[in-house]
């Protein structure tokens, strides 16, 4: 058949959990439920986030805030071209904002590097915007494109990130550009 990839349900992993026991039990249960067999040289893998969680090896929002404050003096911090994510990046952004007075967030547009769109290419064409030359402020972005929600998640990431920054106690400045210079 070739390579087969499966998502396997497992319990919520907490610090100190026996990850080996959980993984073995979870894949054996999935095998029994779904009727597939393991063969010599099959590989079972899990995301590093699961391992880190079981080891208690991750940074909290407060850890990130303390690090940002110590390294950048708690003033203005710039974050360039994050991937649009409610999970991984949002937690980091909370910590960054909690450790700074101001966060300048530069978002690439019309999409991030993995293809998550803020706005459609058609909308850019309609407004005559060249994403390789035009730098937009938040105000200009809203004037041109309004409040766009992600097709699959239904989230307006611009509004979401701005609110995360402000709720963490920092001033937010959001810029849309594709050249970090």
PLM feature segments, named:
Residues 1-181:
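N-terminal and secondary-structure boundary signal
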């Amino acid at each position: 058949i070739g390579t087969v990839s499966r998502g396997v349900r497992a319990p919520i992993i907490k610090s100190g959990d026996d990850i080996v026991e959980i993984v073995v039990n979870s894949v054996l249960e999935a095998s029994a439920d779904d009727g597939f067999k393991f063969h010599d040289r099959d590989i079972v893998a899990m995301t590093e986030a699961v391992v880190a969680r079981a080891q208690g090896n991750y940074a909290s929002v407060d850890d990130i805030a303390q690090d940002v404050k110590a390294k950048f003096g708690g003033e203005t911090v710039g974050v360039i071209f994050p991937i649009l994510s409610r999970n991984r990046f949002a937690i980091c952004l909370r910590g960054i904002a909690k450790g700074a007075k101001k966060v300048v967030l530069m978002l690439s547009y019309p999409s991030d590097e993995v293809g998550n769109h803020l706005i459609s290419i058609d909308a850019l064409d309609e407004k005559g915007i060249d994403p390789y030359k035009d730098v937009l402020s938040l105000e200009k972005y809203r004037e041109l494109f309004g409040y766009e929600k992600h097709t699959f998640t239904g989230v307006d990431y611009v509004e979401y990130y701005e609110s995360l920054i402000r709720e963490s106690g920092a001033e937010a400045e959001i810029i849309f550009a594709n050249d970090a210079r």
